[in-house]
Every structure is written in structure tokens, then in C-alpha cells.
Amino acid sequence: MTDILMKIQDALMNDELISKHFERKDIKFFVYPNANDIISNVIVIDEIFSPSRSDFADNNPLTYDYLFQIDVFVKQKNNNVNGSLLSRELILRVSKIMWQELGFGEFNSFKPEYNQDFNLYQASKQFRGKKYIDEGLL
């Protein structure tokens, strides 16, 4: 079995733009860091619901249905990088990777946020997709 979360992380880290702004340790699963603890950019991949069986044939499930939320946090530092623009660029790149590499389409998009107390931009989207059970993913 292959962990679908690791497959998402690998797809993100194999992208030139994402790997320029994030290290593997900056991609978290399920646990959202405290805003005060974020010192660099962070991505959080959160599974909204456990995989559910779908697309049945002869009463046997053919696919797993997934729903993930991915949040991109960009720390605005005292440099020439526009954190707001970068957070939008990164979440759009995540969306492209999720579709082209994994076949997960955008399910929902959220209002971008800025936490002034911590100079932190956040962009979030949800992605839904199916994988055939025989692909060995879980």
C-alpha cells in the first residue's frame, strides 16, 4: 500500500516553484502549527474525511473517494517578497499539481486571510478525487 499523503507531498516537492519556497519538513499533515510558531512558509495537508468506497460494479467497490484540504501559509518577512502575491501563486501551483499529477480537482476555495499580528498570509483550497482500489493507495 502507498500512502496517498506521501504521494501528494512527493508531487509538491518535485515541483520547482514549491521546492524553492518549502523544504520537505515544511509540509505538515493534519496538524496546523500555531501562528506564533511559524517562522518560514508552511503547507498543511488535511484529510477532510476518510477514503470512502465508490463506483461499484457487481456490488464491489472500484474506487476510493478522497477529499483533502491544503493550506499554504506564507510568512511575510522584511524582504522584497510580496507575501500576498506569493501565497496566491503557490496555492494556484498546488492546484495545478493536484490536477495534473494526481487527478484531484478543486472542490472548494476559501477567502485568503492575513494575520497582521504574525505577518502571515494563508490561502486554502479543497481537492476531491478518486483512485482505483487496485492502484494500492490508501
Regions found by a protein language model. Name each.
Residues 1-14, 50-57, 61-65, 105-138:
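Short, charged interaction patches at domain edges and termini
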Residues 40-42, 67-69, 122-124:
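Broad gene-expression machinery/nucleic-acid interaction feature
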Residues 64, 69-92:
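Mid-chain, well-packed structural core segment of small domains
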